[in-house]
């Protein structure tokens, strides 16, 4: 069922979702806030954009060209509707295409920043795939994997341009190895915890094209207090 929801604590942003597929989560808020280091960007692109939560949030924080890329037509349609109800069709462009084909469309050194909330899970003979193809493609590396993401990023990122991802901690080594394979140097890493005393369940990582070798480990990010409420650092992200 298609519904319109408020984008978490953003009072003036709404998002179109289909409750039969997947719902927008905090991942995208964390990614958008982590990725932005300054406001001097000219061109930003969001891979695996889904129904466009990351471009929506970025549009609140920077004034530049923002593009989202979504391969699944049904999800792309949700993204288009999301832009329309927020009156952002003039500020954000959504492409219905495969990320792997972006290098055929854009010249080398086009983008200052790439953001990506990719499918988290590898696919093998033991993978438990969802009956819904749309859910499966959103969660598993059936249509795109880390190799694809970083090989394309190397081509379309400007020199020293950055790519930021939100991912699972058990894929950290895979991510770093793949980054370095494509001359994208890991620059910042932040571990995210649901609450104090819990295990890390999410990572935020940034790499720079042809960057110097210097990885900065940021302070841990805690999401909830003991009562399940957002901590102040998280609340501030919705400003």
Over which residues does each language-model region extend?
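Conserved SAM/SAH cofactor-binding pocket of Class I
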Residues: 33-127
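Short, structurally constrained coil/turn elements
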Residues: 9, 88, 180-183, 217
